[in-house]
């Protein structure tokens, strides 16, 4: 069987991301040959936590990005596409408007294509598959944490998922609910920590963190923390991928981000401008997870992967 060119699109609460890759015969299990990767911050989940609805302007931003992605599918001759919508799309009452838009835009490139909503369990499975495909077994079992805008997936396993939980907390949701001042007040940060612990509690009952040997962090908050810990003057995905961040360095960066203004965060060289207003919330989630992993599993280091649910989606198209 020849290689097949596939496209994966992950539409989350904060970003919409595209991967075009070759899969199939001649490649190792879990291996992809990247053709194109791209991320756009569209904040689809803007206000969803408060209103339960997608805002018209958020759908418009997402449509603009998806239209560009559809053109790239045609340009790169993608044969199959799978677009998944995660936390934000699970929570809204007007999601039919969103899915009709995706069918209209994607259908122009590959007829019959449209986004699909996936469960938290499916999201965890795809994130795990994308993250551990190239890690081998030396550091297993892995606890993979995919920290998104609206939810955080926590997954334990080696080659297959042993336990997983999708916690109803992410950097956008936490920021909109708790962190209203600029910079956040001590009271706001304290309230945010309590909410994070409350939302993580069922995950900690479900996923036996004490069995883990390696903590793998995915998505924009995690990769940006690695970039800052490495004092990068520009975002370098190759240097971030599989980087290891010592616990002390991780907590120092988190504390610094939480106390900064949005303008100060935006001025940091590796910071994506669409992430500056919510990464403080993400840093609080990371701090709480770091504490739990240190206490429960003795893990005091974060391994950061650039490969995540997007890679898992692409691999799912390989059969």
Swiss-Prot record:
It catalyses: [phosphate](n) + H2O = [phosphate](n-1) + phosphate + H(+). It comes from the Bacteria. InterPro entries: ATPase_NBD (IPR043129), GppA/Ppx_hydrolase (IPR050273), Ppx_GppA_N (IPR003695). It holds the Pfam family Ppx-GppA. The keyword Hydrolase applies. Keywords: Hydrolase. One of its GO terms (molecular function) is exopolyphosphatase activity. Its EC number is 3.6.1.11. It is an enzyme of class 3 (hydrolase). GO terms for cellular component: plasma membrane. Homodimer. Belongs to the GppA/Ppx family. Degradation of inorganic polyphosphates (polyP). Releases orthophosphate processively from the ends of the polyP chain. Prefers long-chain length polyphosphates as substrates. Can also hydrolyze ATP and ADP substrates, but lacks GTPase activity. Cannot hydrolyze pppGpp to ppGpp. This is Exopolyphosphatase 2. The gene is ppx2.
């Amino acid at each position: 069987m020849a290689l097949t060119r596939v496209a994966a699109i992950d539409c989350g609460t904060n970003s919409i991301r595209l991967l075009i890759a070759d899969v199939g015969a001649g490649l190792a299990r879990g291996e992809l040959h990247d053709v194109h990767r791209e991320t756009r911050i569209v904040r689809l989940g803007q206000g969803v936590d408060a209103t339960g609805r997608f805002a018209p302007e958020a759908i418009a931003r997402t449509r603009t990005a998806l239209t560009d992605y559809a053109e790239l599918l045609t340009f790169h001759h993608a044969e199959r596409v799978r677009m998944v919508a995660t936390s934000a799309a699970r929570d809204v009452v007007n999601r039919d408007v969103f899915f009709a838009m995706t069918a209209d835009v994607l259908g122009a490139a590959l007829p019959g294509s449209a986004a699909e909503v996936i469960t938290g369990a499916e999201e965890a499975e795809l994130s795990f598959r994308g993250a551990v495909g190239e890690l081998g077994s030396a550091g297993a079992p892995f606890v993979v944490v995919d920290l998104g805008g609206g939810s955080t997936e926590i997954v334990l396993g080696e080659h297959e998922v042993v336990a997983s939980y999708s916690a109803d907390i992410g950097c956008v949701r936490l920021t909109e609910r708790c962190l209203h001042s600029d910079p956040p007040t001590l009271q706001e940060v304290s309230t945010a920590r309590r909410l994070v612990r409350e939302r993580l509690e069922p995950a900690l009952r479900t996923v036996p963190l004490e069995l883990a040997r390696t903590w793998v962090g995915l998505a924009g908050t995690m990769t940006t923390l690695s970039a800052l810990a490495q004092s990068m003057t520009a975002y370098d995905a190759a240097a971030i991928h599989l980087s290891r961040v010592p616990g002390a360095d991780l907590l120092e960066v988190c504390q610094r981000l939480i106390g900064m203004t949005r303008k100060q965060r935006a001025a940091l060289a590796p910071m994506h401008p669409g992430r500056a207003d919510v990464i403080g919330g993400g840093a609080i989630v990371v701090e709480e997870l770091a504490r739990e992993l240190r206490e429960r599993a003795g893990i005091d280091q974060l391994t950061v992967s650039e490969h995540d649910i997007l890679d898992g989606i692409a691999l799912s198209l390989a059969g």
